[in-house]
């Protein structure tokens, strides 16, 4: 118990950053404005607000002027909420909505500052080389390739519903000392009517944020998960026979872009004070690995089913006693890796078992040795991607391409750019699939949807439109995968583009999940 308390004392000092004055700095709103316009490949921000870039900048300047007025924060948010239900003019509705969005985004940027500074100093202290590569989502998969083939069981964990808002603010007080800023946080959480969109529904494996307060609620959710994972880090380190450096490296990555291992959990100390030392022997396993993204987590182990069951109920008890809410045990599923495929980060992952027979000759005797090898395999779930395209109105549920009417008012170059960017992003994100044939079906759907959208705009048929402008018009914006790979790999390498559809490539520059993958 003393060791746990000493572990917590290392990080007992609070953050001394006073954040509230930053709300009156113009550059904060400029950062929020840039983030809002560039946050989605679907240009959701521009479509939601109904403004172009120029008029949005004008609104930002108007907001900065109003922010100095008395009770401006309260009036702006209340106006935005009331205008949803009360008849107001079109301009007033979008103005209030835009102001509320900008304040929310700016507030989120400010509250992330102490955590970002802490993360940078942490990696400098640890002297972690190339830690920026750990920001990539794809960096998780080489880790799984190396580890999962030697493990037996995997637990699929759905992180439970978010806790009460006041508990989140109280936890945040351990990090931020600025009292006015914390009061403003309470105001945001209690006033926004779209708080329910932040909840994780039982039917979905990922959490859903409202379009208007996405960054704020993402920050709150990340902080909540950060709190959940702290005790797991501590117990895992104390119970491990082998102090592997890779464990710290890969578990630290998920605090916004990395996970920091220190946090105060004083409430839980009282609960586990009597049983803490007796608990450690339950979890002793040198081959246990944990990865998480969004509302899912995977805990894999070489141990027995009994060990995984004990970890399962440990998580349930921790959520119950520390966060004061009950988590159903059915949210954690234990499966044997050899007979199980799991969906994670847009890939359908499994262990392939390959058996090979080798004839061995010793003097006059010969015998056959059967060798069984396991390989971590990742493929693209084409059906789920088609479902995402259907939700985004690019095709029907059966995969038949349709036009995108909402984009028909854009210029031809903008339409081509949007479709081409989505297609290239999908190929880039799913470059780690061992079977890429399904991606070419997705590419066909997007290309034909683009052609139908252009034909709809010009009041023509697809065949007539392509005959008049030529099919090469679409080829220019849908870069073939082989062309991209030829730029990445020099000609002197043994990498053959002919077999590129079977090669798995992981990129270290992907720091956010693709929007279409996020919809599935």
From Swiss-Prot:
Disulfide bonds: none annotated. InterPro entries: Domain_X, Maturase_MatK, Maturase_MatK_N. GO terms for molecular function: RNA binding. The keyword tRNA processing applies. The keyword Chloroplast applies. GO terms for biological process: mRNA processing; RNA splicing; tRNA processing. Belongs to the intron maturase 2 family. MatK subfamily. This is Maturase K.
């Amino acid at each position: 118990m003393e060791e746990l308390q000493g572990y917590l004392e290392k990080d007992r000092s609070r953050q001394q950053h006073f954040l509230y004055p930053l709300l009156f700095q113009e550059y904060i709103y400029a950062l929020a404005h840039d983030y809002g316009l560039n946050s989605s490949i679907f240009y959701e921000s521009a479509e939601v607000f109904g403004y172009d870039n120029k008029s949005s900048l004008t609104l930002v300047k108007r907001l900065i002027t109003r922010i100095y007025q008395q009770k401006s924060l309260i009036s702006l948010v209340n106006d935005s909420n009331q205008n949803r239900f009360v008849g107001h003019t079109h301009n007033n509705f979008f103005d209030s909505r835009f102001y509320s969005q900008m304040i929310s985004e700016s507030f989120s940027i400010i509250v992330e500052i102490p955590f970002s500074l802490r993360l940078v100093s942490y990696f400098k202290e640890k002297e972690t080389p190339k830690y920026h590569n750990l920001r990539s989502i794809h960096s998780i998969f080489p880790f799984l390739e190396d580890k999962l083939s030697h493990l037996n069981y995997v637990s699929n964990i759905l992180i439970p519903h978010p806790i009460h808002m006041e508990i989140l603010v109280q936890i945040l007080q351990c990090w931020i000392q600025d009292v006015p800023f914390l009061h403003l946080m309470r105001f945001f959480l209690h006033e926004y009517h779209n708080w329910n969109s932040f909840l994780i529904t039982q039917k979905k494996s990922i959490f859903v944020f409202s379009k208007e307060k996405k960054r704020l609620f993402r920050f709150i959710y990340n902080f909540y998960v950060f709190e959940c994972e702290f005790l797991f880090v501590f117990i895992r380190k104390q119970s491990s026979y082998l102090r592997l450096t890779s464990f710290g490296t890969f578990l630290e990555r998920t605090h916004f872009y990395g996970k920091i291992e220190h946090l105060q959990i004083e409430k839980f100390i009282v609960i586990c004070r009597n049983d803490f030392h007796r608990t450690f022997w339950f979890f002793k396993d040198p081959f246990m690995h944990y990865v998480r993204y969004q509302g899912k987590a995977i805990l894999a182990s070489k141990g027995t089913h009994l060990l995984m069951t004990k970890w399962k109920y440990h998580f349930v008890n921790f959520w119950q006693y520390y966060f004061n809410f009950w988590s159903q045990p059915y949210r954690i599923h234990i499966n044997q890796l050899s007979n199980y495929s799991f969906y994670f980060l847009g890939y359908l992952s499994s262990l392939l078992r390959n058996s090979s027979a080798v004839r061995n000759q010793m003097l006059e005797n010969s015998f056959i040795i059967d060798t069984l090898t396991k390989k971590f395999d990742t493929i693209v779930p084409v059906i789920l991607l088609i479902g995402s395209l259907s939700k985004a109105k690019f095709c029907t549920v059966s995969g038949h391409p349709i036009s995108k009417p909402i984009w028909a008012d854009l210029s031809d170059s903008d339409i081509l750019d949007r479709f081409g960017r989505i297609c290239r992003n999908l190929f880039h994100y799913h470059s780690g699939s061992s079977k890429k044939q399904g991606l070419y079906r997705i590419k066909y759907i997007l290309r034909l949807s683009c052609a139908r959208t252009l034909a709809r705009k010009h009041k023509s048929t697809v065949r007539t439109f392509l005959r008049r402008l030529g099919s090469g018009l679409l080829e220019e914006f849908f870069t073939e995968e082989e062309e991209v790979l030829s730029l990445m790999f020099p000609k002197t390498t043994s990498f053959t583009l002919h077999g590129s559809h079977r090669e798995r490539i992981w990129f270290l520059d992907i720091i956010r999940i693709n929007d279409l993958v996020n919809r599935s």
